[in-house]
Amino acid sequence: MSKSTIKFVRLSPTKTRLIAKEIQGMNAEFALATLEFTPNRGAKYIANAILSAVANGGFEPNEVIVKSCRVDAGPVLKRFRPRARGTASRIRKPTSHIMVEVSKPSKEA
């Protein structure tokens, strides 16, 4: 089993979790092919995390499965935008931490 972590990615964790749930349990090679054609910004970062986890373990993408893919919330950058009558509204810019674990499939008889 090998792990990979990408921290402080400027993505919403809520939106990125949708992709992470889809690829959990998939073969790593199939997951990478799926992510390549997923029209979401988070797919690129998750694909990089999978490639990194595969390389960390010294595996090939076709011989491992994505055991777990977790997206946690990081710190939120807070910015302000001027509004009418001298007021200001807060803009939240969320960040994410992406954790991926890959391992060889277990031999089930």
Swiss-Prot record:
Biased composition (Basic residues): 84-95
Known role: This protein binds specifically to 23S rRNA; its binding is stimulated by other ribosomal proteins, e.g. L4, L17, and L20. It is important during the early stages of 50S assembly. It makes multiple contacts with different domains of the 23S rRNA in the assembled 50S subunit and ribosome. The globular domain of the protein is located near the polypeptide exit tunnel on the outside of the subunit, while an extended beta-hairpin is found that lines the wall of the exit tunnel in the center of the 70S ribosome.
Pfam families: Ribosomal_L22
SUPFAM superfamilies: Ribosomal protein L22 (SSF54843)
Span of the signal peptide: none
Subunit structure: Part of the 50S ribosomal subunit.
One Gene Ontology cellular component annotation held by this UniProt entry: cytosolic large ribosomal subunit
Transmembrane regions: none
InterPro entries xrefs: Ribosomal_uL22 (IPR001063), Ribosomal_uL22_bac/chlpt-type (IPR005727), Ribosomal_uL22_bac/org-type (IPR047867), Ribosomal_uL22_sf (IPR036394)
Gene3D superfamilies: Ribosomal protein L22/L17
Family indicated by similarity: Belongs to the universal ribosomal protein uL22 family.
Keywords assigned: Ribonucleoprotein, Ribosomal protein, RNA-binding, rRNA-binding
Any GO molecular function: structural constituent of ribosome
Protein name: Large ribosomal subunit protein uL22
GO biological process: translation
Domain of life: Bacteria
Region annotation Disordered: where it falls in the sequence: 84-109
